[in-house]
Amino acid sequence: TDRLKILKVLANATTQMAEGEILQLIHAGNLKLTEAEYFEVITRKTAILMSAACQIGGILAGAPPAQEEALSQMGLNLGLTFQLVDDILDYTGDQKELGKEVGADLREGRITLPLIHALAQAGPPDQARLQELAQDLKSEMVPEFQALLSKYGALDHARSLARQYTLKAQESLELFGPCPEKTYFRIITEELLARTH
């Protein structure tokens, strides 16, 4: 039945989200975190929730299995886009719009893609400086930290990946014929990518 299927989707999502939270705690402050480990955390912690929500929408609407899977994939890719943009905003956003200080996630030990990428690209002197800044980021150090992220294309790399996941989310919609909902979902994908808070 649909109820049982929905319960299975929710149970799986809840389990993966809990595992994602545990992985995030295990990796807190780990400046050797890899891109693959980062994506495992955000997939489990964030993307799986959006995937489940979209899949459940498909189940409730009586979508055929292929469309249900397409909705699940759309949600997964939207979740990855959302988290990547969130991580970019942690380093570039406006404090008033975000409601938190620039670098707040980093100060809480969350190592995210922009820093992972910059550390991987930097030579030893800049790598050492990035590590110093990351371990004790004070407000007056934020401009230097942002400059190092920019120097190594870290924010552009994260934006590029967010764009790729947005396109994948949009591709998932190709299975659906023309309808207002498809248009709305396309708009949502673009708004998620362009958000500033």
Q: What residue spans do the PLM features occupy?
A:
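All-alpha prenyltransferase/terpene-synthase fold signal
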Residues: 1-197
